[in-house]
Amino acid sequence: RQRQMCIRDRYLTGYEDININDIKNFRQIASKTAGHPEFGHIQGIETTTGPLGQGLATGVGMAIAERILSTKWGKNLINHKTYILAGDGCLMEGISQEAITLAGKHKLSNLIVLWDNNGITIDGDISKSCVTNQIDRFKSSNWSTFECNGHDPEEIDFTISKAKKSNLPSFISCKTIIGFGSPNKAGTAGVHGSPLGDEEIKIVRELFDWDHKPFDIPQ
């Protein structure tokens, strides 16, 4: 989901080297709209995050860079936050623990991780491969932790505002349902990296009263 947002947003924000046909070919062989964003394929992608966990580690590096620049040039000039959207797979990789520990050690209060906590991997329920309590894991690594409804924009915004006040890096567990709105596939691995299918799309469109044509972008 994070990677879909990344590719889609490049198109919606006007990058000229990506068009609607590229969007239609998302995650297809030889398509430049790869399943995992890769540096050099399209404009606006600054780093490859395909190996799960690498994006998290890269984000920690960016937060450290901000801290160094802020110390050198002053907070009036350099004072931004680094945000990371992470999935279950990102947190299962070994590289994530090294990055999490480093961020906690240096109290990177300019870093906020939003975890898409849906409990599903491409192989099925997360319990098949992981029993980690992620909240406890981050707490023990010197992070502030928060929880919110990942389908409620106002609650997410409120939780982020609390995280911004912390003097530690922040981890927000956003509880979500993968494939939200799909009556037959929501909450299953059937929507992890796979199309809904024509029949399910038809049902979802009816549920959301969505009468626009496929790939139409309402103004």
PLM region spans:
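Long, well-ordered, tryptophan-enriched scaffold segments
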Residues: 114-219
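Hydrophobic, small-residue-rich alpha-helical packing segments that form membrane-like cores
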Residues: 55-60, 65-67, 73-85, 92-141, ...
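Cofactor-binding active-site loop characterized by glycine-rich and histidine/acidic residues
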Residues: 1-4, 8-105
